[in-house]
Amino acid sequence: MNNLSQIEALLFVSGDEGISVKNMSIITGFDRSAIQGLLEELVLKYDTDLSSALQIRESDDVYRLVTKPELGGTVKQYFDSPVNATLSQAQLETLVIVAYKQPITRVEIDTIRGVQSSGTLQKLALRQLVHEVGRKDEPGRPIMFGTTDEFLDYFGLKSIEELPPLPDFNMLDLGDDIDGELFTSAFDVHQSESEKENV
């Protein structure tokens, strides 16, 4: 395992939220100048490799691994294709958590689900079911996510207020012993009742 591959791995697992130079330094133990040099090397690697679909983007000292703009049409076709019309269980769980807890950060979603959610969030964003709604005022300024109008259309809702209530939801806190199943179970009941009403 070399230094370059460590930085590349961190960019990959951080997903759409990205990772700051400071956090890369904390995790790897490399100093800032070394990380900047490795990032420049990776940027050059992706930019000069015409067969690579990836590139590195930087914003506010946060770096992300993203697909190149010219491949946007191909990526859109993938998410618009019939084979991807149905949400996976992980996508549904993540989406419903965002709906109930928005605005919410990726780390907060991970806390509720108990697993890493960056890849799932990225797919939901590409399907335009969630989007960035701002940044949380805390170290690292993590991205906050919320649902979109496409989310409402997908589930046949007129507004976010039509989401079914969760039991004692206002009493819940991210520190409580809860998981994504709490959210999806309530939503599934609501969907079943709505389908019966439309028969």
Swiss-Prot record:
- Domain of life of the source: Bacteria
* Gene3D superfamilies hit by this protein: Winged helix-like DNA-binding domain superfamily/Winged helix DNA-binding domain
The record's Pfam families line, in alphabetical order, gives: SMC_ScpB (PF04079)
Alphabetized, the UniProt keywords read: Cell cycle, Cell division, Chromosome partition, Cytoplasm
Q: Name one GO cellular component term.
A: cytoplasm
Subcellular localization is given as: Cytoplasm
Function summary:
Participates in chromosomal partition during cell division. May act via the formation of a condensin-like complex containing Smc and ScpA that pull DNA away from mid-cell into both cell halves.
Q: Which family does it belong to?
A: Belongs to the ScpB family.
The protein's name: Segregation and condensation protein B
Q: Which organism is it from?
A: Leuconostoc mesenteroides subsp. mesenteroides (strain ATCC 8293 / DSM 20343 / BCRC 11652 / CCM 1803 / JCM 6124 / NCDO 523 / NBRC 100496 / NCIMB 8023 / NCTC 12954 / NRRL B-1118 / 37Y)
